[in-house]
Amino acid sequence: MADVVLNPVYPADLVALEKRRQRSQIGQEKADPRTVALRILPRLLYGTTHAYANPFTGSGDESTVDAITRDDLLRWHRTWFTPNGSTLIVTGDVTMAQLEPALNAAFGGWARKDAPKKSIGTVAKSAGGKVYLLDKPDAPQSVIVAAHVTERGGLPQDLAMETVLRNFGGMSTSRLNRNLRLDKHWSYGTQAAMPASRGPRPFYVVAPVQWDKTKEAMVEVAKELRGVAGERPLAGEEFQSIMRNQTLGLPGRFDTLDALERAAIDIVSLGYPDDYYANYAKNVRALDEKALADAAKVFIRPDEIVWLVVGDLKKVEAGIRELKLGEVVRLDESGKSTNE
């Protein structure tokens, strides 16, 4: 491990191979309605210059992949891999007394060096009133995305919002799934997410639906967003059910080394207190209906929603325009406007 960290080689043939693989992955993502939506969405929310503007899939763009050289990788490693900017996380049957001598032997010669400071940047609130369309001729489904920029991580309401998300779009019996899948049979499954980050996070709903229910499903998604944000807060038996679901799973949450490792990574990367997960179960059990309602109001803002629909536009565009949700912009698969 130390040799890889301290003396990376980046063989030219393997760099070329990985670039080909990454380009192939990008092509596959663009061919799939759901993943092409997740590629485009960040630029619609953050613009093109923000640190979070890159595709949510993590694969980048063809032009940037093509431009990367072996020298770029070596330069990046020299710049960012520093001991005083690193954290080593070890999980297993080992003590610090056993671990420290081995670490000193392996990494003791790694000279301290300051890495540049990263600037995440700010971003304006989503203005809403925009509907973006991407054509996928003959697609049997439309992928509907409703999204906006929300608050940064590390707020007091984070834990309550985690619980809201589970009941809104994080389970097979969540509100979105009960509506679009179980009740109406328009979708195989929906998702609501708010990925963790240090800067302003995206909140988004992804709802693949049968194409002939695109317009109607957008109406239902908008209704559910208004509901959870205040018109119909989580309460009563619905609240009790989600709390039972969340608390019954707590004892086994950290049964594996992988789970412990992920928790430690969260603490380091997101700036959580060291005792965040030690107090996690207690804090979850202390949540009440008001805490969930307050969190939903902080993080979910229906008036700021930006819409993105990927589907067969010759079949669905007219119905979408009838909703009068705002300016309609057609995009290509790279997220650039094709409006004349």
Show where each model-derived region lies.
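M16 family metallopeptidases and their MPP-like homologs
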Residues: M1-V5, K19, R23-Q25, R34-S63, ...
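A generic secondary-structure signal for well-formed alpha-helical elements
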Residues: V4-V9, I26, Q98, A106-D114, ...
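An aromatic/glycine/proline-enriched structural segment found at the starts
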Residues: V5, T48-Y52, T87-R152, V309-E340
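Peptidyl-prolyl cis-trans isomerase
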Residues: N7-Y10, L14-A16, I68-R70
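PEST-like low-complexity, intrinsically disordered acidic/proline/serine-rich tracts
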Residues: D13, Q25, E29-T35, P116, ...
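Conserved, carboxylate-rich catalytic/transport cores that coordinate ions
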Residues: H77
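Short beta-alpha junctions and helix-cap segments that line functional grooves
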Residues: L103, K118-S119, K130, T163, ...
